[in-house]
Amino acid sequence: MNINEIKRKIIPILLKHGVKRASIFGSYARNEQKETSDIDILVEFGEGKSLLDLVRLKYELEEVLGKEVDVLTYNSIHPLLKDRILNEAVDVL
């Protein structure tokens, strides 16, 4: 599965869950993914979303993609990793 296939599959789910902004980072963004690679996604929700909403989003993304998905919010990126992650991120929304 390439990054364009991932985008096509996840955009409707992201919109359904109230995501305002999203990017893919990590091995898929660098085109270095392996069969065992997870998919790393950054999201920014609209107002009023909780940790439970993040868990629901992660679960639905994993169901559709058939792979493990790590979902982070832009605000939760560790400061020491932030520049590297944002530089390699590929925008989805």
UniProtKB/Swiss-Prot annotation:
It comes from the Archaea. Keywords: ATP-binding, Magnesium, Metal-binding, Nucleotide-binding, Nucleotidyltransferase, Toxin-antitoxin system, Transferase. Mg(2+) 2 binds at residues 38, 40. It catalyses: L-tyrosyl-[protein] + ATP = O-(5'-adenylyl)-L-tyrosyl-[protein] + diphosphate; O-(5'-adenylyl)-L-tyrosyl-[protein] + ATP = O-[5'-(adenylyl-(5'->3')-adenylyl)]-L-tyrosyl-[protein] + diphosphate. Pfam families: NTP_transf_2. Binds 2 Mg(2+) ions. Its EC number is 2.7.7.108. One of its GO terms (molecular function) is nucleotidyltransferase activity. Mg(2+) 1 binds at residues 38, 40, 70. Signal peptide: none annotated. Its cofactor is Mg(2+). A motif (GSX(10)DXD motif) lies at residues 26-40. Belongs to the MntA antitoxin family. Probable antitoxin component of a putative type VII toxin-antitoxin (TA) system. Neutralizes cognate toxic MJ0434 by di-AMPylation. Probably forms a complex with cognate toxin MJ0434. This is Putative protein adenylyltransferase MJ0435. It comes from Methanocaldococcus jannaschii (strain ATCC 43067 / DSM 2661 / JAL-1 / JCM 10045 / NBRC 100440) (Methanococcus jannaschii). The lineage of its organism: Archaea, Methanobacteriati, Methanobacteriota, Methanomada group, Methanococci.
